[in-house]
């Protein structure tokens, strides 16, 4: 059972230029029918033009993230914009490509096989994200936990490097909308006193919502071993220096 195609979304600023091209090349190597949306998150004009020229024969969708529409703290050059641009891009893509399967992939990811396993998982389970180190309590600021009224703080973290959404499903639409609404509110995604030392911004919010919506729907894919691993990809293959270092 297959969807017509999935929309894979990625992007980068200047410090992930080479890393982004590495990810794009891996997509080309293993892709047979899915779409790739590439966001300019702060690439200088020469680099952006180089990417568009290099992949001009591919059927890619090129977009520039318009920071002017959002609060100043979205600026990717200041504390990585608190990663608020990521759920915002997912939401905007959802509005443009309604009822499709959407997958965010960080530029540091590498696709290492065709995406059939990931697609099948999303058709059957609706939301995908592998596990990450620690728990909600370990990597979520208490004010975000309070804001989202999270009670299950011992749950495993999910990984924000790859997040998949089957937007044909009603509660997934609600999930994406709440994810975006939280990203717009700094008190939710990056409250006072939070930093990368004690909080994981978009990943922290995604994790809380992941369990909230799956519990409400009585879905148990979070306990499915298949859903704990990086399906069809690896993460943290950055060539340039990473923001967290």
Protein language model annotation of sequence segments:
Residues 1-245:
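Glycosyltransferase catalytic domains, chiefly GT-A lineage
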